[in-house]
Amino acid sequence: MRLVIVAVGQRVPDWAQTAWDDYAKRFPFELKVELKAVKTEPRGSKTVEALVAAERGRIEAALPKGCRIVALDERGTPLTTLALAAKLQNWQLESDDVALVIGGPDGLDPAFKQAAHERIRLSDLTLPHAMVRVLLIEQLYRAWSINANHPYHRE
């Protein structure tokens, strides 16, 4: 099974890339994690609707065929770490690839969010996109560690 993080925005600070790389290498062979960064639509004189629609096309092109789509959305379902661990366990049992999608500066296209299988919220706080990537991969690793009885997570 693969966890594919599809994120709008190709540039992240070095610290975020270092953190991403550190967590990505910790995952076991049977649970691969990969990042697909797609280009942010240039602003110009376009409306927000036009921007997120263009980004939607890039996101959809990056999605693995037949995957479960989970949109990160500020109005999505809030999760605890244990709830995320339970979701991860269910996803692994289904054995389909899961794409977790992080929108750009203007968020995700409303139609894309509506079509997603799930919408989740990582935090009530507004976070920089680079931080979201790191937070997401860390929480996915933590969820895996809970399910595997690995000592990384402590209650």
UniProtKB/Swiss-Prot annotation:
CDD domains: RlmH-like. The keyword Metal-binding does not apply. It is found in: Cytoplasm. S-adenosyl-L-methionine binds at residues 72, 103, 122-127. It is an enzyme of class 2 (transferase). It holds the Pfam family SPOUT_MTase. InterPro entries: Alpha/beta_knot_MTases (IPR029028), RlmH-like (IPR003742), tRNA_m1G_MTases_N (IPR029026). The keyword Oxidoreductase does not apply. GO terms for molecular function: rRNA (pseudouridine-N3-)-methyltransferase activity. It catalyses: pseudouridine(1915) in 23S rRNA + S-adenosyl-L-methionine = N(3)-methylpseudouridine(1915) in 23S rRNA + S-adenosyl-L-homocysteine + H(+). GO terms for cellular component: cytoplasm. Keywords: Cytoplasm, Methyltransferase, rRNA processing, S-adenosyl-L-methionine, Transferase. Its EC number is 2.1.1.177. Its main location: cytoplasm. Specifically methylates the pseudouridine at position 1915 (m3Psi1915) in 23S rRNA. NCBIfam families: PRK00103.1-4. Belongs to the RNA methyltransferase RlmH family. Homodimer. PANTHER family: METHYLTRANSFERASE, RIBOSOMAL RNA LARGE SUBUNIT METHYLTRANSFERASE H. This is Ribosomal RNA large subunit methyltransferase H.
